[in-house]
Regions:
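Extracellular low-complexity, O-glycosylation-prone Ser/Thr/Pro/Gly-rich "stalks"
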Residues: 767-887
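Extracellular glycan-interacting surfaces
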Residues: 2-771
Length: 887
């Protein structure tokens, strides 16, 4: 948890000040401002733990337990050894510099461990308007200074797993090198990163692009200079290291060397061709440069690869690949040397997606290799490791694959691999979803198994598309990129599983029925299967709907206020509506394809839409829409709008662009007219939360620019005045996808970020409340029935669902279910219920929203657990003093 500082500056907003003026004009000619209040908030993440690609892990070579991780869109992190967690370092990055949350490289200074550097920038094409920068810190990332570069950097571009592109000279730590993309060559600083100049003597800026024909500029960009490695044996303290190796994205000329501290350079003679060198790691003690090669830049692709060893004294090259070239269907990338035992080398098959990634290990400098898993008799395999993902149980993806696939997988996109330079037993590696690690790695060599588990707590890297906070049930439901989304029954615990049945790769939109919050709908992207799903138990369980013809993506979706009908605006076809749960769809009339859709939160027949500056209204359940007469709204589609819970026809709309109308609008007549709020220079999201104690109108939240300041704002008086609730240390880059308050906790706000997960804030004064807690300690009487199902099982772990049915004649107002495991099973995490354990006996109690169970009704909860030996089912379940029947 991090606490913001109370802002001391107050700015004033005059009514009507510059209403409708474009933000560019405001920036050029700032007007006087007054009285914009600020509040002190505490901020933390709704825990997911990971959720995105970690392309780089860097250990400091001279200070034990000092390590950093970089992400492609979610900033950089420092390892906290005492808690085994990661601390975010770039939350200060603001709206205008959002691209600086993409980190292309991190360098930790081995001479002065307090110094750390980050090369930042997300895209090299026009998706990111800003140039890259090098950030420098003298306090391990607590604070930063920035040097802007004359070119862009690509933390989320193809080739981002190669590296490290940024390096500090281990002898003269005022000297740094940076490998640039896009043909900009090699750059050097001689004043500890304050200023930079191109190394004009370096002969090759690279020429490899993933897809030269890509007109967007994303895949067609030259991946440039990919890594810099110093030979520390060729220097002394205070003088620049003489021998420097540089990797280049050029399949014929992938490695260069300087032996005069960068004055001159030459192509390394005798090197292999036809591949890109993803990594170059030097073992100065034995005089070897190890290189991991792939036929592409990754991180997704790569069909062939090799490992080579270069003898720095003789110039001899040796192919040390653990697999014959003809047998590779993957490239190599992750590469590390055990600094305590430099003859020990490890590498990853980063692009082996099926059946799993592979990790190779050699203890004789690449002479012979063993691998993390191997086939016994296909498709059966034997692992040298065990995996325990009980701390992040969703990493199983709810899957039950056929051999040789296993769940959880060892990984994919495994381009970051590092052995702790002070501890041969500790290794960390990044995947497309998490950081895994072990602290008994040398078991590998003794023939016993080493234990892998997530080492990712504190690192939150999901991109958030939508958020809802229902008035009952789970406090938060999220729609996420890559991992689909979660039902967050607790904000401080990792959810057990992402949404499944179906499991969207990306959930694009999410809604619930305001008057019946158990009914939830989501839409999203899926290669094969439906693009829409429904839940009747507040998102705990799901079932897929049926797609209308032509659907290619999730789009936006809205649930009627009573949950009886839905309107869907998917990609690939026009707006559709249905009664029931999406078994049959009909085309809506009067509204264009691609419109954003939402529902009125009171009238179940009223739905709203927006497209290209026009607001649309349907009063017949989405069958027909009529264009509103409202004018002056944003002309583009960069708009989010919502209807107020409990306020029929009360609609708020945020959005726009710098070259046109931009701000926040309010309608009280169902969208027939809108009034633009004065003083809100720009706004991109709007949401609602519990009213303040002395207010009659719900609290408003927005990600906006107000009073010339970008931030997260709160209003308790219907938008008349605004309070900034974040500060400059907590900005999280781009926050324009979604925002919502909490209808049960005054002041709480959930903010969608583009790579830092879901952050939520509470008032520091203590009004923020806590997570909705469990209900009373109940012992209901009456008949009961239990259905116990093991839904997934893996080595050492399992997942189970429990369905408890009231078969009596009286309603329960709270319940408490007891059972005893017959073996050594232990519950590690439970959702939709609170649990306690004494030995092997477990008690599961209701939470507040599922305490009431009518006769004939059921309640379901689930859990993950650990086991060894056998995983037999409990023989009986008891509700108070009554033994339940079994289904």
């Amino acid at each position: 948890m991090r606490r913001t500082r109370t802002l001391t500056v107050l700015l004033a907003l005059a009514a009507g000040l510059l209403a409708g003026s474009p933000p560019t004009a405001l920036a050029a000619e700032p007007a006087p401002r007054a009285a914009l209040a600020a509040d002190s908030y505490t901020w933390q993440n709704a825990r997911i733990d990971g959720g995105g690609f970690v392309p780089g892990i860097v250990f400091n070579r001279t200070e034990k337990d000092l390590a950093y991780a970089r992400t492609d869109i979610g900033g950089a992190y420092r390892w906290q050894e005492e808690s085994h967690t990661w601390t975010p370092l770039l939350d200060h990055v603001g709206w205008d510099d959002w691209g600086h949350t993409g980190v292309v490289s991190v360098a930790s200074d081995s001479v002065d461990p307090d110094r750390v550097y980050a090369a930042v920038g997300t895209y090299t094409n026009d998706w990111d308007p800003t140039n890259g920068a090098v950030l420098r810190s003298g306090d391990r990332g607590a604070t930063w200074r920035k040097t802007d570069l004359p070119f862009k950097l690509g933390g989320n571009m193809p080739g981002r797993g190669m590296g490290e592109r940024l390096a500090v000279d281990p002898h003269d730590n005022d000297v740094l090198y940076l490998g640039a993309p896009s043909g900009h060559g090699l750059w050097r600083s001689t004043d500890a990163g304050v200023t930079w100049a191109e190394v004009t003597a370096f002969p090759n800026p690279g020429n490899y692009a993933q897809d030269p024909g890509d007109t967007s500029g994303y895949a067609s960009d030259n991946q440039g200079i990919t890594w810099v490695t110093f030979d520390e044996s060729t220097g002394s303290a205070g003088t620049a290291t003489k021998t420097v190796y540089v990797g280049v994205a050029d399949k014929e000329n992938a490695v260069y060397r300087s032996t005069d501290a960068g004055a001159t350079w030459e192509r390394l003679a005798g090197q292999p061709t036809g591949y890109l060198a993803h990594k170059g790691v030097l073992d100065a003690e034995n005089g070897y440069l190890y290189l991991a090669y792939s036929d592409t830049g990754g991180p997704y692709d790569g069909g062939k690869g090799r490992l080579y060893r270069y003898a720095t004294a003789t110039g001899a090259w040796t192919d040390i690949s653990p697999v014959a070239e003809a047998d590779t269907y993957f490239g190599f990338s992750g590469l590390t040397v055990d600094r305590q035992h430099p003859g020990t080398v490890m590498a990853t098959a980063y692009s082996s997606w099926w059946p799993d990634t592979q990790i190779f290990r050699s203890t004789d400098s690449g002479g012979t290799w063993t691998q993390a898993w191997s086939y016994t008799s296909y498709p059966d395999r034997e692992n040298r490791y065990t995996m325990d993902v009980s701390s992040s149980p969703w990493l199983t993806w709810g899957a039950n694959p056929a051999p040789p696939e296993q769940t959880p997988k060892l990984g994919w996109m495994t381009e970051a691999l590092e052995i702790d330079p002070f501890d041969s037993d500790r290794m960390m590696y990044g995947t497309g979803a998490t950081i895994y690690g072990t602290e008994n790695l040398t078991n590998w060599d003794s023939g016993s198994k080493f234990a892998i588990e997530p080492m990712v707590r504190g690192l939150e890297e999901t991109a958030v598309n939508d958020l809802v906070s229902p008035p009952s049930g789970a406090p938060l439901l999220s729609a996420l990129g890559d991992v689909g989304g979660f039902r967050h029954t607790s904000l401080t615990e990792v959810p057990a599983m992402m949404y499944t049945s179906p499991n969207f790769t990306t959930t694009t939109s999410l809604d619930f029925a305001e008057e019946n919050p158990d009914v939830v709908v989501r839409s999203g992207n899926l290669d094969a299967g439906p693009h829409i799903a429904f839940s009747t138990d507040n998102g705990a369980n799901w079932f897929g709907g049926t797609d209308p013809s032509g659907v290619s993506g999730g789009g936006t979706v809205a649930a009627g206020a009573d949950g009886s009908r839905f309107v869907w605006s998917p990609q690939g076809t026009g707006v559709q509506y249905t009664t029931g749960f999406g078994t049959a769809w009909q085309a809506s009339a009067g509204i264009p394809a691609g419109a954003i859709v939402e529902s009125d939160r009171v009238d179940p027949a009223t739905f709203y839409g927006f497209k290209s500056g026009t607001f649309y209204v349907s009063t017949d359940g989405g069958a027909t829409f009529t264009a509103s007469a409202a004018t002056g709204l944003p002309a583009g589609d960069s708009v989010r709008f919502k209807a107020l819970p409990g306020g029929e026809g009360d609609v708020w709309l945020a959005g726009g662009a710098a070259d046109g109308p931009y701000g926040l609008w309010h309608s009280t007549d169902g969208g027939e007219t809108f009034a633009k709020l004065p003083g809100v220079d720009a706004a991109d999201t709007v949401g609602f939360g519990k009213a303040a104690p002395d207010a009659s109108y719900q609290t408003l939240f927005t990600s906006a620019e107000i009073g010339g300041v970008r931030g997260i704002f709160r209003s308790t008086d219907e938008g008349a005045t605004w309070t900034r609730v974040n500060d400059d240390a907590h900005q999280w880059g781009w926050t324009g996808a979604a925002i919502t308050g909490d209808p049960r906790v005054y002041g709480r706000v959930y903010v969608a970020t583009n790579g830092r997960g879901v952050v939520y804030g509470d008032t520091a004064g203590g009004d923020g409340g806590t997570d909705p807690g469990p209900g009373p300690d109940p012992t209901p009487t009456g008949a009961c029935d239990v259905e116990y199902t093991v839904t997934n099982q893996w080595s050492g772990g399992f997942q189970a669902d429990v369905r408890l049915t009231n078969t009596g004649t009286s309603a329960w107002n709270g319940w408490s279910l007891d059972w005893t495991f017959p073996g050594d099973q232990r519950v590690t995490q439970m959702w939709n219920a609170e649990h306690t354990r004494t030995g092997t006996t477990v008690t599961a109690k209701n939470v507040d929203w599922n305490a009431g169970v009518a006769p004939g009704a059921s309640v379901s909860f689930g859990f993950t657990g650990s086991w060894s030996g056998t995983n037999a089912e409990p023989s009986s379940f008891a509700l108070g003093d009554r033994v339940c029947g079994r289904t």
